[in-house]
């Protein structure tokens, strides 16, 4: 499956590389556009010393980890969000009869290099924030773990959103609230939101495990909401459970799918 994914993605990358100037402009445009979010945070800190009790470097750390996780998930699996377009056009039927995973084909269709810009911008922010925080080496190991778990969580939400489109062809708007909306939510300390929302993204849609709970461990901060200390280490379990749910949802969608006949 991984080999097929890389082959199909490379095919689209080669096609995009035929037009290098537009390609570079799209990547730079994405980099600059997402950079406006960072500018907004800087503006906020121009008027206050903390946001939800967190300093600038800590907020940038949250922003960077959320951005890298979402950027990788969006780059690798964001196209699953376009499943309804394939269903309406009838191209999904063709994918089902090809000797390759339908999921991989949907994920790599029109593999977008533009998304590299978002990922690169978040990586730069994270690279700048980490040295300013200077966390102890005994805690730094959590950073790659939280990024990997964040990728799995966002990819699973993309997949569940795609599976919903087998039943509701207008489901992308719903899934976007949890993918792109979830990305925006996790860029900031959860202390700026209400307690009910925090509990929802901890125990229902586990967005708090993208970076919030692991970050509390890295930053050696108490949980402002008084949740158990063990949740700081629960990101792998949350990612695994959501990934299994996504796999089951996708398989159920495939079984229920009926050709549009187009």
Which residues are covered by each model-predicted region?
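Hydrophobic transmembrane alpha-helices and immediately adjacent juxtamembrane helices
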Residues: 1-262
């Amino acid at each position: 499956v991984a080999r097929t994914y890389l082959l199909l993605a490379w095919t689209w990358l080669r096609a995009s590389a035929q037009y290098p100037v537009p390609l570079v402009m799209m990547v730079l445009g994405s980099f600059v556009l997402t950079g406006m979010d960072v500018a907004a945070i800087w503006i906020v800190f121009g008027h206050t010393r903390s946001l939800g009790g967190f300093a600038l470097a800590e907020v940038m750390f949250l922003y960077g980890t959320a951005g890298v996780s979402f950027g990788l998930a969006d780059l690798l699996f964001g196209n699953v969000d376009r499943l309804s377009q394939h269903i309406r056009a009838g191209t999904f039927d063709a994918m089902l009869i090809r000797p390759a995973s339908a999921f991989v084909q949907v994920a790599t269709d029109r593999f977008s290099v533009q998304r590299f810009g978002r990922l690169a911008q978040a990586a730069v922010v994270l690279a700048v924030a980490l040295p300013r925080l200077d966390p102890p080496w005994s805690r730094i190991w959590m950073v790659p773990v939280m990024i990997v778990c964040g990728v799995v969580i966002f990819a699973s939400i993309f997949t569940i959103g795609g599976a919903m489109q087998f039943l509701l062809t207008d489901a992308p708007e719903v899934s976007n609230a949890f993918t792109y909306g979830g990305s925006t939510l996790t860029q900031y300390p959860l202390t700026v939101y209400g307690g009910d929302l925090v509990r929802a993204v901890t125990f229902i849609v586990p967005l708090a495990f993208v970076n919030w709970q692991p970050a509390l461990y890295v930053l050696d901060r108490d949980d402002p909401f008084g949740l158990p200390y063990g949740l700081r280490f629960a990101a792998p379990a949350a990612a695994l459970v959501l990934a299994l749910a996504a796999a089951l949802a996708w398989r159920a969608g495939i079984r229920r799918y009926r050709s549009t006949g187009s």
